[in-house]
Each structure stands twice: as structure tokens, then as C-alpha cells.
Amino acid sequence: MINKDLIALYKEHKQVNQIKEALSGEHKNRLHVTGIHGSALTVVLGAIHSLDNAVHVLVVDDKERAAYCFNDLEQIFNERELPFDKRRILFFPTAYRRPYEIEQTDNANVLSRAEVLNKVNSVGSNLVVVTYPEALSEKVVTRQILKKNTFSLREGEEVSMDFLTDVLYEYGFNRTDFVVEPGEFSIRGGIVDVFSFSDEFPYRIEFSGDEVESIRTFNPVDQLSKQRMTKISLLPDVQNRLSKEARETLLAYLPESAVWWVDDVTFIHDRLERELDKAREIFENLNKDIKHLAPGELFMGGREFFKELGARKVIEYGTGSHFKGESIVFRTQSQPPFNRNFELLLDNLRKHTLELYINIICADQERQLNRLQTIFEDLEQGKTEKERVAVKYLQLGLHEGFIDLDRKSTRLNSSHVSE
């Protein structure tokens, strides 16, 4: 079994198609989806993502859970090894460790945020963005400002190295001997290396006179080429370099047709208010001789969140709902604990086989699946083919297994069965 088979199962799911139909059309929609447990959330979202071209934003309660959901989706769609320009599953983290302290920004996170903004600008649809309240609280530069501060370059384009160097200096890039992190560039002969905030790898731009001969991404550690590019976008540190520019919320930045998946609207409101209060407290103690944007211009509070979310398509997937809307009920259960009791696991799988469930065991690595398969074969020695438990194996490291009672043909277990 492969990942596409799992998504294919859920594309035929009755409730998944109810969500798809409810989201169709231009008007704003309100859905309350209940009964989703374990990694059923990411599988259902993955199926919806496969059925439409919208931008879907999954907002979960904290960074750790957001990372798990992102990892699920990244694996479901086999995007872990894809170059960034091919990816459709994106992570939107916080940039600041502390508000107003540029030196406390996380460069890797600034890169991830810039990648999302750039991807939305260049692609605009068929994306999934995973985020959490603290990241959502930080406003972003507007589309117009991002476009104004993005320099596009094509293979075969006539442009001089001197002109490109001037652009990089103007954008705040630092010249170094070797590029190591975003925001740096280097020049050696007819080659310009640039680590843009638009890609996870730096670009190697080779010139022939005043013409761009070739563009490749490369690994800064071993200097080996990764991928040939025909067109690239050079993007500066929009988080800090453009700190005085006008900002807007991610809600305003994304297309109005974007679908927002939210667990607990009230919880997010309260968390955003707390983040805004924290920024206000720090702002009051700043050096007044240096001009800073006010907290409300840099951070989104709960009221602003309520107002802007109210004008968007929203799917609430928690136990309660803030908006009035159509209710869609799934019947899933969290995977029960087996605590390395493989006989108990087999009994459970056998019970579901008799009830005509499909038993799917998932694990991140093939060796884990092989180990489980060997254990099952040892425990079922002497049994006929009909007496043996029917199991499908899927190399997919979902964070949490679940049982789907609706399909009655789907049973999902994660690699946690052997823990």
C-alpha cells in the first residue's frame, strides 16, 4: 500500500465530500466538523486538499502539535525530499523569540515565513499552510511591499554582475567569502552565490559576460549542486529589513478564498491577546529616541482575529464552535494503547477483520514494518490463511493512529503499536 491509496480512500469518504460541497462557491462558509481523533485530522485535510485548489490554513493550539501535523501532511504527500519550488505543504512559524528584539529572531523561521509569503504570491492556490497562534500573531509585510522587494532572475537574461551586486546590497544582503545562511552572497570570478530568503538552499548564478548562463541551488556544506533552475526570486529579510513598512495579518495576506481550519477560536483569541499584551509591555520600555512601529501595527490581537476570521471560510474541528454553521460529524476513535502487547494487538486486529475493517499499520521506516510483520507471522504460526489477520502495511509515519467507524473498511495504526 502507498500513500496515494490512503488519500484515495478518504477522497471517497462521505463526510469528506460533504465538506468539499459545503466549501464550493464564492460565499463564506461556516462548518463545525466533530469526531476527528488522532491523525484523522491531517488525513481528512489531505483528502480535501487533493479535491480542490484552495489555500488551506491549519491553525493548531501550539507549536509542537503544529510540527506533528506538518510532518504528517509532508509525509502523506511525499514532500519531505522535494525541492521547495515543488512543495505545497508549508510551515509558518514565529520569527521572534521576543518582540522588538531583532537580534532575537530565528533565521530559519524567518526563512520559513518568507517562503510561505513568496509561495502564496507566486502560486496563490493549492497550498496547505500549518501554523499556530504565536506565529499567527506576528503580522507580515503586504503583498505590494513584498513584490516591490523581490528581484526575479531568469536563465539567459541579460543582466550584469555589477547590477546584481548593487541590487543585493540595496536589499541588505551581506557579502561574505562563502554563503552559510540566508541574507548572504559571495562572488568568485563569474559566479555569484546568493542565499535568498525565498529558498531553503542558496543559488549559484553563473554568468557569461552580461548574461545569466545557469542557475542552480546547492548545498552550502558540501558545495554540491542540488537542482537546476530556470527562474528564481531573490528575497531579502522581510521580517527585519522592512520592519518600518506597513504590515497586515496573515488572514489579510492570503486569498479571501482561503479555508481556515481552527480547533478552538476562543482559545486562539485569548492567546493572541496575551501575545499583544506582551508586546505592549516590551514596547513601553523601549528607547523612545528610536522610532518603532506600535504593537498593534506589528501584532494581531484577539479582536482583530475575530473580525478578520469572520469574513473567511472557516472549519472548526474542536468540540465547540464559535460560528453558527453546518455540522459534519465523523466517527473516529483514538488508537488504543497496546504497550508492546502484540497478542492484544492481534486480537484487536482480528476483531476488526471479522467486522470487515481494513487494518492498515503505518510506520516511518520499512524496518519497523518488517519487524511487526515478522512478529505477527511468529504469533500466527500454525494458522490457516483464512485464520490469519488481514493487514496492509504503509510506510507513513503518522503521529497518531486512529480507527474510522464510518468507513468500516478503514483501520489505521501508527508505529506506536510497538512502543
Q: Where in this protein do the model-derived segments appear?
A:
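ASCE RecA-like P-loop NTPase motor cores
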Residues: 1-411
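Single conserved hydrophobic/aromatic residue that forms the stacking wall/gate
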Residues: 412-419
